[in-house]
């Protein structure tokens, strides 16, 4: 499978939703964001697809908040994201510049940022060091996001992982 062969990520052991949500109850969790990853151009596939996230969110809309992912290098990237927001009901965008190999301020991402602003949806960026094979941290250094924030003051952005190790 693509995930296992490319990233060493295998499906977790079987667990029913009832078991999962019982564990959540113990931990005081009520919801979780589901984050797919489109690596179409950098690695040849998806780690988790928008369709898989959509299906899980439809099963448990009270528990899961689904995000979309779009490889910014795809020629159809804006169309894929608009479909995710309008038709699939996904509520934000997950980008991983290190794995998707783009600088956050690269013009290829501009149409995606504009769509997020238009729909009022947040962007979660993987920021900082990545342990994934082939991921280049130069694309996810925290300073790389400054220009995006400057040019898109209305864009809601989250830098995941606090951009470790470039944090104090």
Positions of PLM-derived features:
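Mid-domain alpha/beta scaffold segments of enzyme catalytic cores
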Residues: 1-111, 115, 119, 168
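Catalytic pocket-lining loop regions of alpha/beta-barrel enzymes
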Residues: 91-92, 102-168
């Amino acid at each position: 499978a693509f995930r296992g062969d490319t990233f060493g990520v295998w499906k977790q052991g079987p667990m029913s939703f009832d078991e999962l949500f019982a564990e959540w109850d113990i931990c005081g969790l009520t919801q979780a964001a589901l984050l797919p990853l489109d690596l179409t151009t950098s690695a040849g596939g998806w780690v988790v697809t928008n369709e898989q996230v959509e299906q899980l969110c439809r099963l448990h809309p009270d528990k899961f908040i689904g995000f979309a992912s779009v490889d910014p290098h795809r020629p159809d990237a804006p169309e894929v994201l608009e479909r995710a927001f309008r038709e699939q009901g996904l509520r934000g965008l997950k980008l991983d510049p290190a794995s998707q190999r783009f600088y956050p301020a690269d013009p290829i991402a501009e149409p995606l940022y504009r769509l997020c602003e238009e729909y009022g949806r947040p962007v979660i960026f993987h920021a900082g060091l990545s342990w994934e094979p082939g991921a280049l941290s130069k694309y996810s250094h925290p300073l790389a996001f400054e220009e995006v924030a400057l040019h898109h003051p209305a864009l809601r952005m989250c830098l995941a992982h606090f951009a470790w190790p470039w944090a104090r």
